């Protein structure tokens, strides 16, 4: 050991354990434009002051550990440590606090969502001093945003590729999600696309199982979409799920999709992992493929109100990692999603600049600078009666995806697709004429039934179907 190192390590070092708040709670700190800011919902254990809990989060997710170490003297902790700079109680909740933590940008590898999450949430959630912990939001500084490619193409490029403007895009998840042969699967794809849908979709757990290997599915689905394109004169797509057990296999499937000439592939970004997702997004940018993202496993992470990671954080991470579509909930369907909160992270996916708005769960102003936007996908328990609400809630830049709401039509798959397309076109026309979809939606759909027997049959089947449960994800 050099004399210089010996001196630096020994000066001011005192072994032992000290409160985190002595080093990591800094209420006078002024945040920098280059800091990554985090808002944590903290539930301390009984007897743990909120300042100590917030400081513990800052410490354990940056430079700290449970005891003083002599190697602290070999670096500048003031430069690299996370800081809990503000704590506020959560209204209406006992012993819950929002702890705001600032992280210096030098703590994170450029262009790596994997490293960002490993640092911020990788270890601290198991900390014994905390009864529960939830990451509510992140502010990503523009200096860090610029290190990411982001979505392979973005909203405008996708519309130009598809030559479709002025309305939401329509999709359908093929059901049953498991058990069909590749040929029968392709038949369902063809019928739905021929009936008027823009996309059909592999479900998230369709990979390469014994009953339907991936290569067979890719071939039959490609044949189906080319046939549907020829008959309708519209560009069609099927989300070919490239998710696989290894990154190499995933890329091999994406390469085959590109060779077939299809416009879009798909990935399960949470189960597949951020490193795999970013790799696939880069491949898609370089090779002209759109990338549809499914959020399988998200509710394991985001559904509990006081522990986990809110989906708005996972949505931001996906925009950085890369994807042109992502499932975002429906507000009106069978899956969790409160309206204001859902629209908050939908804006975080689509818009360039989003102001802080606590009424929608947005804790920080976010500037995405030149990062392309992501189309939100509304999917899960929706049908033709939901079309006015979906059109009003999500607007044109969205994908409305009806699985059972297409394939469950009493006359078959193609009539189910026709019903959805007619309902959508009726809602878009009514909106463009200045009508209020929220108030007049049912009337608009009933009137359209006069011109479409397929829509009338769908309306009759699903007239009593509702999913009226209280949302758990509330402010």
Swiss-Prot record:
* This protein's name: Ribulose bisphosphate carboxylase large chain
Q: Which residues carry this modification: N-acetylproline?
A: 3
> What further fact does the record state?
The basic functional RuBisCO is composed of a large chain homodimer in a 'head-to-tail' conformation. In form I RuBisCO this homodimer is arranged in a barrel-like tetramer with the small subunits forming a tetrameric 'cap' on each end of the 'barrel'.
Q: Can you cite an annotated GO cellular component?
A: chloroplast
- Annotated positions of the N6,N6,N6-trimethyllysine modification: 14
Under PROSITE patterns, the record lists: RUBISCO_LARGE
The annotated site for Transition state stabilizer falls at 334
Task: Write down the superkingdom of origin.
Answer: Eukaryota
Q: What is its EC number?
A: 4.1.1.39
Q: Which gene underlies this protein?
A: rbcL-A
Q: Which residues bind substrate?
A: 123, 173, 177, 295, 327, 379
Q: How does it assemble?
A: Heterohexadecamer of 8 large chains and 8 small chains; disulfide-linked. The disulfide link is formed within the large subunit homodimers.
Which keywords, in A-to-Z order, does the entry hold?
A: Acetylation, Calvin cycle, Carbon dioxide fixation, Chloroplast, Disulfide bond, Lyase, Magnesium, Metal-binding, Methylation, Monooxygenase, Oxidoreductase, Photorespiration, Photosynthesis, Plastid
Please describe the post-translational modifications of this protein: The disulfide bond which can form in the large chain dimeric partners within the hexadecamer appears to be associated with oxidative stress and protein turnover.
Q: What species was this sequence derived from? A: Pelargonium hortorum
């Amino acid at each position: 050991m050099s004399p210089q190192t010996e001196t630096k390590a020994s000066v001011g070092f005192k072994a032992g354990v000290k409160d985190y708040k002595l080093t990591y709670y800094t209420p006078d700190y002024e945040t920098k434009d280059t800091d990554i800011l985090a808002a944590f919902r903290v539930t301390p254990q009984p007897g743990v002051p909120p300042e100590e809990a917030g400081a513990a989060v800052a410490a354990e997710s940056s430079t700290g550990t449970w005891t003083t170490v002599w190697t602290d003297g070999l670096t500048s902790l003031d430069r690299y440590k996370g800081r809990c700079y503000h704590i506020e109680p959560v209204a209406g909740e006992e012993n819950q606090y929002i702890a705001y933590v600032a992280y210096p940008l030098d703590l994170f590898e450029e262009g790596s969502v994997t490293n960002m999450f490993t640092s911020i949430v990788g270890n601290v959630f198991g900390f014994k001093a905390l009864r529960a912990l939830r990451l509510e939001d992140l502010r990503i500084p523009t200096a860090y945003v610029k290190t990411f490619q982001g979505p392979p193409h973005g909203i405008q490029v996708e519309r130009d590729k598809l030559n479709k403007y002025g309305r939401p895009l329509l999709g359908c998840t093929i059901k049953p999600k498991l058990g069909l042969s590749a040929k029968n699967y392709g038949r369902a794809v063809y019928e739905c696309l021929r009936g008027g849908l823009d996309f059909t979709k592999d479900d998230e757990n369709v990979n390469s199982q014994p009953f339907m290997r991936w290569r067979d599915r890719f071939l039959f689905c490609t044949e189906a979409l080319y046939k549907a394109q020829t008959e309708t004169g519209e560009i069609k797509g099927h989300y070919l799920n490239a998710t696989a057990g290894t990154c190499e296999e995933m890329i091999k499937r994406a390469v085959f999709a590109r060779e077939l000439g299809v416009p879009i592939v798909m990935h399960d970004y949470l189960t597949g992992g951020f490193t795999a997702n970013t790799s696939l997004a880069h491949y898609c940018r370089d090779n002209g493929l759109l990338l549809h993202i499914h959020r399988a496993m998200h509710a394991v992470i985001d559904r509990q109100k006081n522990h986990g990671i809110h989906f708005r954080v996972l949505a931001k991470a996906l925009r950085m990692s890369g994807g042109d579509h992502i499932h975002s909930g429906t507000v009106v369907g069978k899956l969790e999603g409160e309206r204001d909160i859902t629209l908050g992270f939908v804006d975080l996916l689509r818009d360039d600049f989003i102001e802080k708005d606590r009424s929608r769960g947005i804790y920080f102003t976010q500037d995405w600078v030149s990062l392309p936007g992501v189309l939100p996908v509304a999917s899960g328990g929706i049908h033709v009666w939901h079309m006015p609400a979906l059109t009003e809630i999500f607007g044109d830049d969205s994908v409305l995806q009806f699985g059972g709401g297409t394939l469950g039509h009493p006359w078959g798959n193609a009539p189910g697709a026709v019903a959805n397309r007619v309902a959508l076109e009726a809602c878009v026309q009514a909106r463009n004429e200045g009508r209020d979809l929220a108030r007049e939606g049912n009337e608009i759909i009933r009137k359209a039934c006069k011109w479409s027997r397929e829509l009338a049959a769908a309306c009759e089947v699903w007239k009593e179907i509702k999913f009226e449960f209280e949302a758990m994800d509330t402010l």
